Amino acid sequence: MTAALIAAASMLTPGAARAQASLYVPLDDIAYQFADALIARGELRGVSLLERPYTAQQMAAGADSALSHTHSAVIRSYAIALRTALQRYTVNAAGATTSPDAPAFLLNGDLFSTAATSGEKELMLADTNSSVTGGGGVRLAMVAGNIAAIMHPVMDNQLNHDPDFAGRQDRVIAGRMQDAYVSGQWTYATVFVGRMARNWGPSSLQGLQLGSAPYTYDHIYTQIGTDRIHMSALATRLDDAFEPDGVYARYFYTHRLSVRWRDLEVGASEGMIAYGIGRSYDPSLLNPLNIYALSWRNEHVSGNLTLGGTMALRTAFGNYSSELLIGNRQIDSCPQLTCQEPASYGFSATAEGVPLFGDQRLFASYSRLSGLAYRAKEGSMGEYASLGIGLGQEFSDYDEVKLGADLAIVPFTTIRAYGAYRRQGQGDYHLPFPTPEEYPTTPGFLQGVVERVPRRGGTGGGMIAPGVRLTGDLGVNHWTN
């Protein structure tokens, strides 16, 4: 439950219309629950189905468009709730244009409480670490013309119970910097420096190549082009790898070419974990328009390379998305056993907003990540992870199917009832890569003892009172192996 305490101060003067920067909306904000409900019913057509986060400006435009269309009272309430949720990221509510000489500032805060029966956030693999904790956060933001900046520290004692958190867990008050960035936004280019979660892939799932499974980390992000065609790139330094011969500096680079034509979106991407003792940022990998695979082969740029592809299509009968990830794959002529490693891959597909009756919609998803995904033959220095958590998804060697109904029956409240089934093997990207002698006997998928987990549950969020928000995921698991 979140109680929002909002106080905004603005220094604005009228000015000529121009490109205006906007704050980004974090992926864990309740605004996305209302946005997803509207997208499933044909709204917010201006945003991508494959790249997040969105800016508050993008989401507000989508909410206003939904309010201008004919909808039931429940669907209209979603648009109103989305607009309300965005107030925490809107520094110029009066609609005036800011400039470097007339910036706008925002200061607001949240108080929240979390009740959980599992410390592990992946509820299909829930543990028994129950807790009830509290916390709070503060946002201080500024928008000045084409520049937007924010800092968002949080105090959250749930961190002490999360097995994925790499920080100290013996503190009376736990905290971290959740979001902190400065972003320059122009007509054909965006530059972002700071930390914020990102997701490339079907929006209802974690991205395979770039997802929000890790805690937010500092990075440089650039985007060049238009909404119809653009190149996005991200670069960051990861945690060091300590090996017997020294300390390896590790870096993560990824870039994605996105093309939108009418209701179709397609994307092609590369990811690279580069490493070395004393290594620094590599200009050939910082170049967003370079092709990593060519530098990897032709210029001897060592690293763990992955390739990805995404597709999304909006139709009158629902929105359909998919993602493919390819890791270790031998493409050169190499008859030796050392070059015949098992394939590393991932695949996901979703269907959202499939008409049922009235405002009710169906959804479905399937995702799979192979047993050797995110692992590297070179060892821990090439591991596709940040502080031990996959840069895309948290777990490998699994597949999961989910089916459910998106129910628009309560105003200002989203409800998704679902059934899910997961198969989880013992393949783990923290383990050493198999030796060449082990290749013939290493399963590519579902290694070792396989855990099977069916789950029935429901997830949703709502505005239950002015300034009070409630989100949750309740369900029952049954484990067998």
Where do the language-model regions lie?
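Short, hydrophobic/proline-enriched secondary-structure or compact coil segments at domain edges
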Residues: 109-111, 291-292, 481
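Short N-terminal segments immediately surrounding and downstream of signal-peptide cleavage
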Residues: 19-41
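Signature for the C-terminal beta-barrel architecture of outer-membrane proteins
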Residues: 199, 219-391, 395-403, 408, ...
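Sec/Tat signal peptide C-region and signal peptidase I cleavage site
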Residues: 13-19
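Predominantly the C-terminal beta-signal and adjacent terminal strand-loop region
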Residues: 463-481
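Bacterial N-terminal signal peptides
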Residues: 2-13
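Outer-membrane beta-barrel channel domains
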Residues: 22, 41-50, 54-57, 62, ...
